[in-house]
Amino acid sequence: MAIVGVLVGVLGGAAIGGLAAARATRQCRKPSDRAGQAVLHRMNASHAGVTAWGLGHVEIGTDFTILDVGCGGGQTIDRLTSMAPNGKVFGIDYSEESVVVASETNKHWIASGRVQVQLGTVSQLPFPDATFDLVTAVETHYYWPNLPADVREVMRVLRPGGTFLIVAETYRGRRNDWMYRPTMQFVLKAAYLTPDQHRALLVDAGYEDVKVFVDESRGWICARGSRSG
């Protein structure tokens, strides 16, 4: 599981506890300084598999305008830009270090005018209503400050008929859940949801055609919903 791997990398093999746990939690939730850069590059590599799997559950038009929320090191932005060759991709993150690393990862796309990366928060997205055909959230919704309200804020910036896709590498109730739950709930203090809770999250926010997919062997999940229209 990549989250645990990132934690071990941050801690340098130390036991997760006390100040070490606090430092690891801080870097996973909001990377900063040199340690944060290392975490972001690690995430770019470790999240590649689950990202490819998750994006396989959504249709992406060649001219889509796309937002990646919590863009981290920017690898998802790069993948999305390749999948929408006539479109444009925006990335936001509330970590300044993430914006720097994601911009470096996508500097060739930025230079061509096809990618824009900026500082921002999911709770108050810096975009007009009905801007995007697709909004993605890869390995990030765990940490959103007010998950139900933030999911509704995502809907605001979706165009009618647009799609919101959550992709995550773990979920509550997965195989060997006992190995991951302490890290997710007590170390990272993350929103650790079951598949049914992912479904309810989107349905309660007003999304339509909600689907939840799991890869039980790897413990991966993605949840997809559309704005009416």
Write out the residue ranges for each language-model feature.
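C-terminal alpha-helical "lid/dimerization" subdomain adjacent to the S-adenosyl-L-methionine
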Residues: 23, 30-44, 163-224
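Conserved alpha-helix/loop element of class I SAM-dependent methyltransferases that forms part
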Residues: 45-64
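Class I SAM-dependent methyltransferase SAM/SAH-binding core
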Residues: 67-124
